[in-house]
């Protein structure tokens, strides 16, 4: 009985009963394939930024989830434009940014955007035709793509 009582007290100390707020959830980790080459865009105010989309899923029979990630650090633009190509399997870390967006008669809704922190290439796309497509291929990585386990 003593053990049961102490384990309950211990579990109560580990569990927080405070409410979760949007600002409490910040960093997301994604693995998946890029749906197209990274895009270099310009805002209405003339600021340059980039956008890429990662498709991820939890198995072959599950529909993919698409995540748009935005890059605002112009220092990385050229490097990212070189390595982030359509079909590349990537590991991405991004910060979740929440903002209010007007929703018509209902008031406003919270919308989440993903701000790029880092991206690592796991696999480059395979060149199935054997022709020179300009994309970098790695024959040693020709194994079937791994299933996303996240």
UniProtKB/Swiss-Prot annotation:
Domain SSB intervals: 25-125
GO biological processes: DNA replication; mitochondrial genome maintenance; positive regulation of mitochondrial DNA replication
Residue spans of biased composition, Basic and acidic residues class: 128-141
InterPro entries the record matches: NA-bd_OB-fold, Primosome_PriB/ssb
Source taxon at top rank: Eukaryota
Chief place where the protein resides: mitochondrion
Alphabetical keyword list: DNA replication, DNA-binding, Mitochondrion, Transit peptide
GO molecular function: enzyme activator activity; single-stranded DNA binding
Annotated coiled-coil segments of the chain: none
Location of the transit peptide in the chain: 1-22
Record region (Disordered): 127-150
Any one of the GO CC terms: mitochondrion
Protein location: Mitochondrion
Keyword Cell division: no
S-adenosyl-L-methionine found in the keyword field: no
One Pfam match: SSB
Role of this protein: This protein binds preferentially and cooperatively to ss-DNA. Involved in mitochondrial DNA replication.
Name this polypeptide is given: Single-stranded DNA-binding protein rim1, mitochondrial
Source species: Schizosaccharomyces pombe (strain 972 / ATCC 24843)
Source taxonomy: Eukaryota, Fungi, Dikarya, Ascomycota, Taphrinomycotina
Gene: rim1
């Amino acid at each position: 009985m003593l053990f049961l009582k102490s384990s309950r007290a211990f579990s109560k100390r580990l569990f927080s009963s405070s409410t979760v707020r949007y600002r409490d959830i910040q960093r997301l980790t994604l693995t998946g394939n890029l749906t197209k080459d990274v895009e270099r865009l310009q805002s209405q105010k003339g600021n340059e930024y980039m956008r890429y989309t990662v498709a991820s899923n939890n198995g072959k029979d599950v529909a993919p989830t698409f995540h748009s990630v935005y890059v605002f650090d112009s220092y990385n633009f050229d490097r990212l434009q070189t390595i982030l190509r359509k079909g590349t399997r990537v590991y991405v870390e991004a910060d979740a940014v929440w903002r209010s967006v007007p929703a018509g008669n209902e008031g406003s809704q919270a919308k989440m955007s993903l701000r790029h922190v880092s991206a690592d290439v796991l696999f480059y796309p395979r060149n199935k035709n054997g022709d020179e497509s300009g994309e970098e291929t790695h024959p040693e990585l020709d194994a079937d793509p791994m299933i996303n386990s996240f």
